[in-house]
């Protein structure tokens, strides 16, 4: 349950690491240029032999009168179900916080339901939650499952807050609470602008993950007032030298003074080739992604000293770490704070006790909400904004906060 070997990043699970989850143990997973689709749950929602999801909740916790469903994978693929149980634990921790605080009303009861590892399982769990009369659905995890459960919830007029980091599955009434590609790109691009950089460019893998980041980079760079000078894509790392050769003249002319290399698997290669070409961090600011945050090998790479990247403020995770370990054993995964935040959000008086509860205009309050990781907002199109810090890699892999948490 998030213990030894379970170094889960948000993108690792939610971007859908099909090949990695199929072939690796949790301790050996490598993130980076991966697909947004998991191998289980195609168009027909096949579950790879998954048993039908039981109609009864696996568990209930909380003592409030408003029924809220929490849909998570608790069976099926071992890696995914391990994360699902950890997020269920984080939700229980949030309920425990509510119950222990006399200044917070106990408004909700959580009904925990198993989605298994398929779209069909998510549909089944969502249907059972609707029959039970829930007012809000939290989860599921993957993009395919959020889509499946979201279709059920939307038809029933029940809002759903899923945990995928793929904004394409969001829509009116179906929200995604996570760090989306556009969120981290907006944070990083605006930081570059504030630092006086004028020519951002990017190198992205030709994968669904890379394409989503590339699209977000273009959109957010233009929104920040930049005219992106170059956007490169690659299908194989063997193309890296060619890309650097193409970028070098633009760097020399000052047209590129910041370069996004967000893909974990290739970042060190590109940084090394730039160093060999005589490009320093003073000339070109290297920028990574939130996916870099816990890759110790990457952060210790000398070629990346001085690089920056957006990340979730770890203060929130650190604040619940001891309580989680004491109650459940092991360390909470990075995503624990999202399940914790969603549970606290569901209990908010102005949302849960409204008539009717969880109306769209309430959930999309422009002021946003204070979550375990800081400020976040939900928008009418179902997407979200999440407060991020800017981290900078120093000599020897020492990482510091260059700019505090903000949206």
Regions found by a protein language model. Name each.
Residues 129-141, 161-163, 201-204, 254-266, ...:
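Periplasmic-binding protein-like
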Residues 159-161, 168-190, 231, 301-313:
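Short beta-strand elements at the ligand-binding edges of bilobed clamshell
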Residues 327-402:
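Segments of small-molecule ligand-sensing domains
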Residues 1-23:
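N-terminal secretory signal peptides
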Residues 85-86, 101-168, 267:
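Beta-alpha junction/loop-to-helix N-cap segments that form part of ligand/metal-binding clefts
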Residues 176-233, 329:
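An alpha-beta-alpha
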Residues 20-45:
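Bacterial Sec signal peptide processing site at the extreme N-terminus
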């Amino acid at each position: 349950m998030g213990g030894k070997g379970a170094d889960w990043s948000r993108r690792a699970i939610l971007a859908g690491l099909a090949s990695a989850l199929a072939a690796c143990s949790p301790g050996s997973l490598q993130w980076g240029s991966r697909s947004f689709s998991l191998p289980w749950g195609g168009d027909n929602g096949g579950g790879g032999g998954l048993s039908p999801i039981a109609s009864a909740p696996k568990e209930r916790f909380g003592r409030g009168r408003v029924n809220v469903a929490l849909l998570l994978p608790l069976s099926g693929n071992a890696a995914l179900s391990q994360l699902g149980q950890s997020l269920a634990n984080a939700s229980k921790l949030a309920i425990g916080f509510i119950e222990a605080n006399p200044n917070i009303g106990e408004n909700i009861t959580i009904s925990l339901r198993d989605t298994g590892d398929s779209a069909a399982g998510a549909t089944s769990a969502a249907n059972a939650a609707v029959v039970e009369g829930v007012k809000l659905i939290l989860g599921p995890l993957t993009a395919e499952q959020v889509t499946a459960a979201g279709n059920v919830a939307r038809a029933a007029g029940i809002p759903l807050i899923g945990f995928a980091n793929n904004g394409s599955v969001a829509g009116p009434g179906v929200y995604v609470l996570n760090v989306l590609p556009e969120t981290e790109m907006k944070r990083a691009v605006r930081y570059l602008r504030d630092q006086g950089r004028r020519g951002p460019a990017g190198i992205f893998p030709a994968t669904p993950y890379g394409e989503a980041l590339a699209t977000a980079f273009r959109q957010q760079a233009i929104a920040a007032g930049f005219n992106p000078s170059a956007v490169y894509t690659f299908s194989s790392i063997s193309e890296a030298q060619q890309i650097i050769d193409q970028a070098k003249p633009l760097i020399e002319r000052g047209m590129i003074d910041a370069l996004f290399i967000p893909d974990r698997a290739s970042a060190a290669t590109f940084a090394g080739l730039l160093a060999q070409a005589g490009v320093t961090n003073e000339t070109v600011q290297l920028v990574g992604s939130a996916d870099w945050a816990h890759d110790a090998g990457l952060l210790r790479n000398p070629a990346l000293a001085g690089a920056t990247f957006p990340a979730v403020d770890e203060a929130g995770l650190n604040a619940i770490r001891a309580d989680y370990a004491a109650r459940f054993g092991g360390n909470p995964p990075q995503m624990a704070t999202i399940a914790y935040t969603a549970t606290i959000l569901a209990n908010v008086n102005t949302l849960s006790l409204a008539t009717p509860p969880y109306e769209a205009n309430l959930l999309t309050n422009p002021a946003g909400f204070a979550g375990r990781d800081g400020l976040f907002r939900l928008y009418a199109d179902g997407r979200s904004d999440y407060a991020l810090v800017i981290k900078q890699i120093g000599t020897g892999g020492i990482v510091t906060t260059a700019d505090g948490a903000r949206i």
